[in-house]
A protein has these predicted regions:
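Conserved, structured core segments of small domains
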Residues: 1-91
């Protein structure tokens, strides 16, 4: 399994209406251990989340099912593989 840092930029006209469904989706990912942390940036221009997947293809499947992606609420997003090294939850 690999960790990925996903950063998003919101479509300002669409994201607020979709946010409840997006958060429900992320809550399910958190409950099954796939999602470590997520949240919006302080300026509400986008957000970031740290997510675990088998590989980039598996991550893409997860992202493709996110209501923000399905409903066009993102202008863009970037993905970088991330190697957690230190922190309270890193073992």
């Amino acid at each position: 399994m690999a960790w990925f840092l996903v950063q998003t930029v919101y479509n300002q006209e669409k994201y607020a209406a979709v946010r409840p469904r997006h958060r429900e989706y992320l809550a399910k990912l958190a409950a099954d251990g796939t999602l470590a942390v997520a949240g919006p940036f302080a300026d509400d221009s986008g957000g970031a989340f740290l997510i675990q997947a088998a590989d980039a293809d598996a991550l893409q499947e997860i992202l493709d099912a996110d209501p923000y992606v399905v409903e066009g609420a993102l202008e863009s997003f970037t993905v970088r593989e991330f190697n957690p090294t230190l922190g309270a939850w890193v073992q």
